[in-house]
């Protein structure tokens, strides 16, 4: 009984993996046919680099307060 359940589980996982692979391949081929696959990849690289640069710029402008805490003076 356990073997039958394992076989059903294994076959369903194989079917899901095959469907996922075919969906990603078809989407990739659609994007490549339109010529936007490489452009989209470059935009994603630029966006990720831009967000990294922006976050580091914000971190460098942050002011670290030094001196007495006004909340403790109450």
From Swiss-Prot:
Keywords: Developmental protein, Differentiation, Glycoprotein, Hydroxylation, Secreted, Signal
Signal peptide bounds: 1-24
Any one GO MF annotation of this record: receptor serine/threonine kinase binding
GO cellular component terms, A-Z: apoplast
Superkingdom of source: Eukaryota
One GO BP: cell-cell signaling involved in cell fate commitment
List of residues that carry Hydroxyproline: 65, 68
Keyword Signal on entry: yes
Glycosylation, residue list: 34, 54, 68
Similarity comment: family membership: Belongs to the CLV3/ESR signal peptide family.
Name of protein: CLAVATA3/ESR (CLE)-related protein 19
Organism of provenance: Arabidopsis thaliana
Annotated gene: CLE19
């Amino acid at each position: 009984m356990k073997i039958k359940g394992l076989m059903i589980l294994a076959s369903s996982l194989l079917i899901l993996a095959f469907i996922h692979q075919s969906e990603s391949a078809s989407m990739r081929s659609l994007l490549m046919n339109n010529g936007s696959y490489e452009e989209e990849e470059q935009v994603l690289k630029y966006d990720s680099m831009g967000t990294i640069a922006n976050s580091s710029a914000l971190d460098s402008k942050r002011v670290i307060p030094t001196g007495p805490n006004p909340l403790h003076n109450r």
